[in-house]
From Swiss-Prot:
Gene Ontology molecular functions: acetyl-CoA carboxylase activity; ATP binding; carboxyl- or carbamoyltransferase activity; zinc ion binding
Enzyme Commission numbers on file: 2.1.3.15
Identification of the protein by name: Acetyl-coenzyme A carboxylase carboxyl transferase subunit beta
Binding site for Zn(2+): 31, 34, 50, 52
Residue ranges occupied by any CoA carboxyltransferase N-terminal domain in the UniProt entry: 27-284
Stated family: Belongs to the AccD/PCCB family.
Gene: accD
Assigned GO CC terms: acetyl-CoA carboxylase complex
GO BP: fatty acid biosynthetic process; malonyl-CoA biosynthetic process
Length: 284
């Protein structure tokens, strides 16, 4: 009976917390698609592709190492352009910070290389640097690389990864859409092959210029590709867009891409395309 009149406790015992595991930073990488936790080393050995098919972004040098013959890449010197043409506040400090963090001069790396002995000019954008945005340096580097390819009679393979035009450079940035397009037009008139390889993300002014001007336009699986953002389009047209809108697969279904190529097939695909076009020279 005494237990019946006994006052109940107003608290509950707390479960003892499990000790926190002090894992080294960068040891594990979580897939944003399937949420699986990978050992970063194993993920890198798998060319940063998850078992679910998600393609993690590659750094410019990682993609070059995976693509071209070992020791064949000859990097072109960067163009001489004014770093801050509009004197935008803090812009130069941000560029310096990105250079230290990424180890590259700007958001694109261009050079001459070979794939199984087949010569080509390759340009790779790196979204770690200012989100791969296109300013005067990026535009002129790509245009100069394309002009070099034209003079040497070589095909061009360009990997895009960009948030679009660089806002800190205003009209100077937008001019690069025309600059790169003109260089590619001259390359095309010389009867040479240009393959645009779109990776995640390819948006804005880049998607509206050289990213979609290839003789072959291909993309990695799941890549976000588009000009304006999804929300802006939905607000403008006042309609709900499909779930897979602006993905590589959606563009392929719509006829805006020629193929969606898994990263493991990238090198063999490009080799085959260059061989099919007589080493990148198209007969006109």
């Amino acid at each position: 009976m005494t237990a019946f009149f006994k006052k109940p406790k107003r608290y509950m015992p707390l479960r003892q917390r499990e000790p926190k595991i002090d894992a080294p930073q960068g040891l594990m990488t979580k897939c944003p698609s399937c949420k699986y936790m990978h050992y970063t080393k194993q993920l890198n050995e798998n060319h940063k592709v998850c078992d679910c098919g998600y393609h993690f972004p590659l750094h410019a040098q990682e993609r070059i190492d995976m693509l071209v013959d070992e020791g064949s890449f000859e990097r072109f010197a960067g163009p001489s352009v004014k770093a801050n043409p509009l004197d935008f506040p803090d812009y130069e400090e941000k560029l310096t910070k990105d250079r230290k963090r990424t180890g590259i001069e700007e958001a694109v790396v261009c050079g001459k290389a070979t794939i199984d002995g087949l010569p080509l000019v390759v340009c790779v954008m790196d979204a770690r640097f200012r989100m791969g945005s296109m300013g005067a340096y990026v535009g002129e580097a790509i245009a100069s690389a394309v002009r070099t390819a034209t003079s040497l009679g070589l095909p061009v393979v360009l990997f895009t990864a960009s948030g679009g035009a660089r806002m800190q450079e205003g009209m100077v940035s937008l001019m690069q859409m025309a600059n790169t397009s003109i260089a590619l037009k001259e390359h095309d008139e010389a009867g040479l092959l240009y393959i645009a390889y779109l990776t995640h993300p390819t948006t804005g002014g880049v998607s509206a210029s050289f990213a979609m001007l290839g003789d072959l336009n291909v993309a990695e699986p799941g890549a976000l590709i588009g000009f304006a953002g999804r929300r802006i389009i939905e607000q403008t047209i006042r309609e709900k867009l499909p779930e897979n809108f602006q993905t590589a697969e959606f563009l392929l279904e719509s006829g805006q891409l020629d193929a969606v190529i898994h990263r493991e097939q990238m090198r063999s695909f490009l080799k085959k395309m260059i061989e099919l076009h007589d080493g990148g020279v198209r007969h006109v």
